[in-house]
Amino acid sequence: LVPREASAERVEDIRWLNGALGPARDWDVFLDEGMPPLFSHFPRKRGLALFRAKAETIRAAHRQALQQTVGDPRYAVLLQAFTDWLDRRTWRDGLSEERRAKLAEPVLDFATPLLEHTHRRVVKRGESFAELSSEERHGLRIRIKELRYALDFCASLYPAAAAKSYLSALSSLQDCLGVMNDIVVTQRLLDEAGLRTASAARQVIEGWYGCRLAVHEQLFAELWRGFGQCSRPWQD
């Protein structure tokens, strides 16, 4: 319902913020969630200890950059502008009469076709999961997230049990793909840290994450089969 041009400025602001938020988040996930089991398993591996110290330094630098971003006047303007955009509904200013008329339609008439369309996009991409590149898998995760949020917003319109089961399946798929995406991001973080391909520490890390990726690829296949057995709540 909201034209892209109506949200273009807001999207640009969020991209600016994410430029600082994204790297800080990536290093937090890597050091707080991904690496602790590896550090515990190899407590005496000197190369890993040295890498950990350097990684913490890099994380601290990204956190400082994020603090500077949040302290930038643009951040305060961003928050106020976004709040006004929602509260005052200024996003409606440029809508055509046809789009304005759609806002008055019953939400069920809008939600059901949207959910069905998004579901089909997810299924089309997910059926060929094994052939997808890492970028395409990330795109699938975004589609699943869109479908999950859309249904979560409209869940009260449909049978509760079916909606709960479907949302649970989507959440599991999203989490599994999220871990796989974090594993892919690891390569970029190792490059950023200057860890040489031939170094023992990098080989240990890549081997560890390679095993995690294989496990989650198998898990995704199981979760996908379960998702395929879920009834679509908007069809009940």
Identify the meaning behind each predicted range:
Residues 1-236:
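Function-determining surface determinants
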